[in-house]
Amino acid sequence: MLLGGAATMQAHAQGASRGAAQGTSGSQLAVQVNDDRITLSVAKVPQVYLYGPIDADAAQRVGALIQSRKIPPNSDIYLNSPGGDLAAGIALGRLFRAGNMTTHLGSPRRTATQPIFPKSSQCVDACAYAYAGGLFRWAPTGSDRFGAQPVAGNASAATATAYLKDMGVDPQVFGNASSSEVTWLDAEQMRKDGLANNGRLTPTAVYGPANGGTSLTLTQLARDGEHRLILQCHPDGLSITANYAIGADRARQMVARATHSYFEINDKPAAEDNHANISTVGSSVVFTQSIPLAQLSQLPSAYLMAAWLADRGGSVRYGFWMEMDPVRNELRSFSSGCQQMAKQTSTTKG
């Protein structure tokens, strides 16, 4: 049901509608909150659609819904707007980031009072700045369009630039400040420029000595939980441990169903005997596997590492993958240290 203003709040309070909208006059940003049982069972979080022009009071209305937890933290935000008030767009983005929310492009669901919505969506101008506030930002799909536009005027441009930097987005992605033209970005370009991360933050690396050898810990925060790879080099070999944090119940279910678990490097088996041991520790599935030091040569140039487990049928696999380019320097340092250790071990045995 689509309702406006105070009627929406009343419908939520009475439980008469779980899909409601504010600001439906056509000159304001409208809000549709979908938190019905089916949505939550599939998406795990509410799906919130913001559509129409971003008016000056849009952030205040959305903020009130967040404050009342009608829009709870970690919600999925779907945007479809031609833009509007820049300050309001930036304020919306900061609300999204504070709530660890995920931004997408998308049109609201059809309802009895609003049976027709365009299938394609666009997000441009102030909407693009709101989108940048998502902790996780999904690139557009299908015919959806994303338009980045620089801000003119010294004060406004400085504010917009500072905001994008705070959100971890390179301001240059939004174009040259000397031009006011919209740059329409496709999914590949947004992913390449870091504007879209498709549910995965850039991995971080910690390299150093550990237990008589060297250790490299790679951590990535993703939409479905935390992913971690721990590589440890010892005189007698290399071990890889993966932590796939997905919740205690789901972790136990996956391990119970699994028939095969393994690591991959560059989409290929990490070892000739590619079988990892798996267990549940807390809320994580934990993979462990030993790899001969002789296979270290593939690590410095690796572009992808992954940990997978297959279910009983073998047709579906679960797990995660991690790009190595963001942690290339630490990976090379670790590989160099391991190779040096392998030489010393060989000399000692000789």
Question: Locations of the language-model features?
Answer:
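A generic "folded-domain core" signal
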Residues: 14-17, 21-22, 30, 46, ...
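C-terminal segment of classical bacterial N-terminal signal peptides
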Residues: 2-11
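Cleft-lining beta-strand/loop regions that shape enzyme active-site pockets
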Residues: 30-142
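Stable alpha-helical elements in mature extracytoplasmic
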Residues: 58-62, 88-92, 123-127, 134-135, ...
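Proline/Glycine/Serine-rich low-complexity intrinsically disordered segments
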Residues: 66, 79, 100, 108, ...
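Short secondary-structure transition/capping segments
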Residues: 115-121, 151-154, 210-214
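Catalytic and GAP-homology cores of small GTPase regulators
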Residues: 26
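Charged, glycine-interspersed solvent-exposed loop segments at helix/strand-loop junctions
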Residues: 75-76, 147-209
